[in-house]
Structure formats: structure tokens, C-alpha cells
Amino acid sequence: MQEWKEKIRIVRGRLAWASLPLCFCGLVLFDAALRFFYRAAGSTRFLDWRAFVFTGAWSLLLTGVAALLPPLGRRIAMGVYAVFFGLLSVVHGVMFNIFGEFFTFSDTNFAGDGAKFFSLSYLNLRKALVASIVLAMLLLAVGAWLVPKRQPGKPRWPRLAGASGAILLSLVSVVLLNRSLLPQADTMTWGSLFDPNSEEQAYKDFTDSNRCLLMTGLYQYTARDFVVSFGLEASPVDLNSLDQFYEERAGQVSGENEYTGLYEGKSLLMVMLESIDTWLLTPEYMPNLYALQQQGTNFVHNYTPLFLSAGTFNTEFISQTGLLPSVTGLSSSIYSTNSFPFSLAHQFSQQGYTVGSFHTASAGIYSRGSIHQNLGMTYHSGAEMGMDDYMLDSQMMEGYDMFIPEGPFFSYIITYSGHGPYTEEMGNISAPHWEAAQAAVAQSGVESTPANLEEYTHAVAHAMETDQFIGELVAQLEADGRLEDTVLLFYTDHYGKYLTDKEFLYQLKGVSADSPELYRTPCFFYAKGQQPQTVEKYVAPVDLAPTIVNLFGLDTDTRYYMGDDMFGDQGGVVLFPDGGWYDGETYYTSDYQGEVTQEMRDTSAMARRREEASFNTLRADYFARREIS
């Protein structure tokens, strides 16, 4: 045994020179593996020189920092690199699998709440990627093991000088390349065209995580994302520019139309459906909801873009305020502290309506208790409604008298049972409907692997639970004579993103990964006695607030909404993050390669200006500072 230890010591001593090169190679491998296996996530080539320069410079910098440390510190540094960047690579992969976008530090605003819904099924990473991450960690581990002990008498200045030179070279490279990618100060204007081919604009905004990671590599992406996400380089908001925007906006909103005041005096039951995608809303799976859709005013071109990775809160906030949340640079606390005088709850409350919000989860999830209070409505959890199992939407009927009070009311309900994962982890949702779901799926003609079909069956069973609640709710409204004076609005928070196999999801929706149709979701009003109607206009949740205030005849200044009345003569363009948009013909994003017309330039200027105005309104707490109410 002693002989083997001596041999290992000798080998370790002879290979000590390889410690720092192994550290460098391990760091490079983390980036190369992530970008190679997700190279289809954007239009940037894997061999793009900027990513390799950034990665080489950052890897050299981190290796140089380790080299400056004493042996124990060097080993610790390499261990930290291995664990941190290994986990970060896994997080990027998981986030991309779920949301189709890489991780950004802005996601940490809601990370604690999102973690409560985490499932091991989301760790479905490619084996080759996992192997590459493990190999990179092993390279760093071996590099740490090979770090030589202190050698008294041996001069340290060559190592320190070399490390300092490497750090200096790395910093110069990163700074120069960073500056070259940023646009000149006089080339960017608030209303300028979103040029999908402008690398400078994408790098400045740094909101397109896929494009930016592929363009800059793992390490520069991490550093710049941290700076942008936490607003460390944000300049003060120019309130005068916002004043000008809203003055111009006053002349752009739709005026009164044939739908103005159509529902005046009626109550509104606004129901946001958790994960009820188009492929679930069928007569076989959700007969109650489907019947209401066919009898109501159906918006067949409704889309729910995700400005935040917290998809439910994303659509919740947008639909209640008519504002678009900032992708980066804002603390989640602004939703609880900013002034939102034009929220739907405040507008209905001013008309004497009883207002409230209802969801099965606790008030702490996404800080709904404080946020909803700030928006003007009291939040009621499943426990307050008397539910035994918060996962079962049908048990929300225990709180019926709370969300259907006497007199006119505005009640906001968020369902839960459609939530993923679609596995046995939430088997208590599936169980009451499992046999019915199996029978319906067997008749559907949907074909895939056994694993996919099992998930699909769970998803159908989850939807059936939500449909049971809707059926019981409408029946009780009818029995109580309240259906005649109550308008129901149903819309979905986000597409059905919880299926593990995304190709199977695309098959179900009949779309490709980069199609805007992936984001098309149900949205319709139902009012008893009203003739069925199909609306072809292209709309989104940001259009709900101005539509509702017009339908209910509320005296609201709609210039302060970023959307447009769904029945008005304005709008018809769906705003996507990063300045993108879709009007049914053109999907204008960073991947757009066609001819750019003047009309498209005008639409891009509008989309970009509205998004930035909304972000700056939130950043500055504009309504409070201008005392607008």
C-alpha cells in the first residue's frame, strides 16, 4: 500500500504542471457543451468567434485568479468553479426544457415560488450534455487534485507574474469586445426600429436569453445578465419622456363603439385557467368549458407571450393592469409597492362593486396576498374557501358564496388543477377522472410513445377536474338566478408547457418550436342570452383591461393601458418580448429574415416604444410620482 501511495505521489508531482491547464479546459468545456447541444436555440452559429473569445478570456481570467491563490485556496477555487458552473449549466438546460429559454437572474424574482412546483421529470437533459458537464467537473476536480503543495525556497514570482499577465490580457479582451458590441450612444432612440439583425441592440437590451447566450458564451452571458437583471447599469427614467408618450397615446386609443357599455351594471367573473391549452379545450375533454366557448364571444387569435418565466404571474399581472412587466432590471417588490390606479379591481371598486381574488394556493406564493391587495382586491386562498385539497378545482365551490356575493361584483379566479407535472406526483388530481381520461384519449387518435401518452392522459384528467368546477359553477349560478346578470371571462395563463417531450407538444398543437402559434391560447366572454360570435382580431392578455372597461362602461383613461380594445379600431398586433410582434402575417423577431417594409418599421417602433414605456412606468413608479389616479 505504501508503495502505491509513493507511486501516486510521484505521478501527481510529475503532472502538477497540468493543474491550471485542466482548470482552463474544464471551464471552456462547460460553455462549449451548453452552446453545442443547444445550438438550435437561436440563429447564432456555434463557431461564432465572439463566443469563443469571451469564453477563452473568461476561462483564462478565472484560471489566473486561481493561480494567484495559495495551494489550498486554488483547490477551493477550482471546486467552486466545478460546482457553480456545473449546476448553472444544468439550470440552463432545465429552464430551456420547460420554457424554451435559458436561465436569467431575473428569474430569481420568483424562483422560490416556482421551486414549489418543481418536478424531477423536468430534469430530462440529453445524456451527452450531462456527460459533458460531468467531464468538465472531473477536469476541474483533477486539476484541483494536482495542485502542488507549497515548496519552500521555490520562487513564486514566475507563477504570479504569469497569472497577473493572463488576468490583464483577459480583462482587456472582455472590455474591448464588450464595448464593440454595445451600440453608439447616438444610434439608439426610444422609438427606433427593432432590427432583428442588430447584434448591438440585442446585446444592449440583453433580454433575448437564447440569442445572448449563444452570442457571448456562458461566462460573459452570466456576468452581463447579472448586471442587466439587477439594473446595475440602468439610467434614471426620464419622466418627461413618459409624459410625452402618454400624451401621444391619448390620440391612439380606440373611442366608443357598438360594444361600449354592453355589460354596464353586470357583474364580472374573470377566470384565468391554469395551462388549459387549445389541445385540451375539446368537447371530449372539457364539455362544459367548450359549450360556453361555442356560445360566447370567442377570440380565436389570442396569444399569451411570456415576458416573465413565472408564466402564471406574467399573464395575471398583464391582464389586471394592462401593463407589460419588465423582463429584466426590476425587483419583484415593485408589484407590491407601486401605484396601479388603473387596475381592474380599482376601477370596479370605484363603481361600488365588491372585488376579490380567489386561488387555491397560499397568499405567499408569488406574494399574491400583498400584490393583490396593492391592486385593489383582497386575496382568498384555498384554506379560506374551506377546501380540503387545494389541488382540486372542484373544491373551490366551497367558497362559492365568497366569490359570488350579493350585488354587483368583480371576482378574479385563478384555477389550479391544470398545473403540471403530468405525473403521479399530482395523481390526486388525475385520480377522480383517470378512467374517463383514458377512454377519451383512446378515442382521440393521438399517437406517441407510452410515456408521452401517459403524460397526455394525466393532462387530460387535470383538465377534466377544471371542467368539473366550471360546470358546477355555471349550474349554481343558473340555479341562483345570477347567470343573467353575470358575465364570465375565461382565458389561459400560458400554453401547456408541462409536457416533458416538447416535440410531442408541438405535434399536439400542430406548430414548430419557433412559431407564434405555440402561444395561441383560449380566450372568450360568455353572457347568457348573447348571440355566439367569433372575433378574428389578433389579441393578447394586455388587451383585456381596455376591453373590459369599455364593455362595462367604466370611466377610465385607457391611454394608460399598453393594449387596445379588442372590439376597437386600433390594435390587432400581439406584442412579444424583445421588441417582437405578430399580426397574423408577420412574426417579427430576431430570427426574421424577410424584407422590411415601412409599415413593418412603424409597427416595430410602436411595439418597442410601448414595451419600453411600460417598463419605465414600472421602474419609476410613474403613476405615484405624477400623482395620476
Residue ranges and their predicted role:
Residues Y221-E258:
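Extended low-complexity intrinsically disordered regions
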Residues N97, F118, T207, T222, ...:
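Hydrophobic residues in alpha-helical segments
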Residues Q2-L218:
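Transmembrane and membrane-interface helices of multi-pass
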Residues Q244-S629:
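Solvent-exposed soluble domains appended to multi-pass membrane proteins
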